Amino acid sequence: MIAKSFIASFLFLCFAFSGVKADGCSEENGYYYCNQASEVEFTNVGYSSTYNEITNMDTSSCSCSSTPKSYGGNLAPFDEEFSFHFRGPIELKRFAVYYPDTSNALSSLRKRSNNQHMKRHPHHKRDDVIDSTLTVYETVMYTTAVYGDSATTPAASEAQASSDILSSLASLSSASTDNLAASVTPTTVAASVASSVDTDSASATISSVVDSATSSVSTVIPSSIISAAPPDSASESTPASTSYASSTTSATSTSTTSGSSGSSDWGRSSFYEADSGTSDNIVFLNNMGGSAGSGVWSSCFGNSLSFAASNGVDGASSSQVLENILVASDKEFSIWTATECNNDCGYYLPGIPAYHGFSGAKLVLMEFIMPHDSSSSYNQDMPAIWSLNAQIPRTLQYGNADCSCWTTGCGEFDIFEVLSTGNEKMIPTLHGSQGSSNGNGGGAGSSDYFARPTSSSMIGAVIYDTSSSGIYIIDVTDQNVSFDSTYSASDVDAWLQSGATIVQLSS
């Protein structure tokens, strides 16, 4: 897995023209970080395309076969089954998955047939090598009021700005990439939107939650395109994207997350608690296949998935509950449902413990600590929490790129990832084909970051909202979240925060 932020390849060229360093951003070990965030919202998530679904893995020839699989719709392909992965140093305290309708939580699984880039670093969670270049543009937040009781049109100034953007993009589209690379200066890394706010859809969404409410919707615009005002006045009237907290999107505009469940409660489907040793509808796996009675090993594909021992590190012959333990640097384990595949998971490597992942609209809660640790020379002190299209680990997570769907864009979501040794900033990134014509080269990421919890635990919430095509990552540590068996829509709405960092994927 490559740890970097992606945006649409066409916009990469356009945004690279800006050579102005964004205020508030700083470079650390080759990466650019801006503001600490309490919430990051990925919007406009969902794409129609194909990826290569693996159909066979041959241990005699070390080759794999695949066939194109179509996908599409809101959140696609991130609405498919995904597994959750954890790399040390990490102490996982609690983990839970909720669905809008408890009675349908597991049955829905059986129904499924189922950029400029940031600088690449050597510590990949995957072995695939992807060409990458440093992101080098500044963005500003252009804020327009949207009224929930009417589908108002953008202000004239915004409409003009949007028109200027489109004209600028068209004029830049034939630019030489060599000239771009030679003329840029490192600035903010963020996914950006070069379009006007869709006020019709925004108003309809907001009004479904709050009648006659006023909120603000922010459009991220490359600074190289906004040239009408002098630098001083621009900095006063259009704050830089590195000041997301001051360019707020109100909670009412994001509270549509509850639209996935309507007025229903979120019901808990899976739960783990380290202190009590409780585990319900959860299976812990790792990549130690063939070493302790589960999974397989081959010279072609190495160690497959296996049951994880209670220490999270070793293999086991049967399912075990993860202990209340620190998993050291560079060690990984994953979480799945306890529902075994029964000719309903597609192809997977024969001999592995094959389980369903988590799909569709859902709420994921996780409590964890990421203390510093120097026990490994590789991936030292670089913890991460991420999710993968479940087909990837069930075939080949690390190794021959032709033996998983990863490179063709079936989906990876880095939720809380530390990019360099000892760093205390965690960033989120979506990896997929959306916004790219080249396999997994699309997606989006944010250089606004979450603070790494090194001494006390953090509780993170991830909401997958199929109704609004949004994925929300929220730090709910101070929200008195206790991993209850159910949550009401209003409970979840209360977690959403104003001033969230908004990352909108290109269509």
From Swiss-Prot:
Molecular functions per Gene Ontology: 1,3-beta-D-glucan synthase activity; hydrolase activity, acting on glycosyl bonds
Keywords: Cell wall biogenesis/degradation, Glycoprotein, Glycosidase, Hydrolase, Secreted, Signal
Organism: Schizosaccharomyces pombe (strain 972 / ATCC 24843) (Fission yeast)
Name of the protein in its database record: Probable circularly permuted 1,3-beta-glucanase P23A10.11c YJL171C
Cellular component aspect of the GO annotation: endoplasmic reticulum; extracellular region; fungal-type cell wall
Stretches that traverse the bilayer: none
One of the GO BP terms on file: cell wall organization
Domains (record comment): The conserved ExDxxE motif might be important for catalytic activity.
Protein purpose: Probable circularly permuted 1,3-beta-glucanase involved in cell wall modification through beta-1,3-glucan network alterations such as increased branching or remodeling.
Residue ranges, annotated region (Disordered): 228-266
Cited InterPro entries: YJL171C/Tos1_C, YJL171C/Tos1_N
Localization per record: Secreted
Enzyme class: hydrolase
Reaction(s) this enzyme catalyzes, per UniProt: Hydrolysis of (1->3)-beta-D-glucosidic linkages in (1->3)-beta-D-glucans
Domain of life from the UniProt record: Eukaryota
Similarity comment: family membership: Belongs to the PGA52 family.
Glycan attachment points: 480
Secretion signal, residue range per the UniProt entry: 1-22
Disulphide bridges, residue numbers: none
Database matches in Pfam families: YJL171C_Tos1_C, YJL171C_Tos1_N
